[in-house]
């Protein structure tokens, strides 16, 4: 299978500048129906959303970046809010979003993580992650198998 090597920044739009963290106190005042995401998933529900669509969230910090007890990337869709502990990604025409999800969760990215007490995947380091990508048609074929297996 022929692949091309890209840095993540070449195949994705990073939407981190749209993140707005809310303190626990602020979230209590703003309870609602929209999911509020942190590094590892939904941590609350709030009354408004910042994003509407399908995105890939990649954990920015936390122990799980080293222990990998859970996936560090997750696909989210619909209307939601994200705090400043998860990177927000949309892919371009070179890469399917769900393909990147599987790829990131199966890669060793330890070389891009800094911090010993509090592991962190900075935006600058995340943009440098090297990815081997096949063409879109091949990605679609691989995804059809992976998604079928995941549904079982």
Regions found by a protein language model. Give the residues of each.
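Short, flexible active-site-proximal loops enriched in glycine and acidic residues
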Residues: 97, 110-117, 132-142
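A common structural junction motif
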Residues: 107-111, 148
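Short secondary-structure capping/turn segments at boundaries of alpha-helices and beta-strands
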Residues: 21-24, 43-45
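A short beta-sheet element
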Residues: 38-105, 114-117, 122-126
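Non-catalytic DNA-recognition/assembly elements of restriction-modification systems
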Residues: 1-20, 26-38, 128-140, 144-152
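Generic structural signal for secondary-structure transition and capping sites
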Residues: 16-17, 42, 109
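Residues that form generic nucleotide/phosphate-binding pockets
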Residues: 11-14, 103, 112
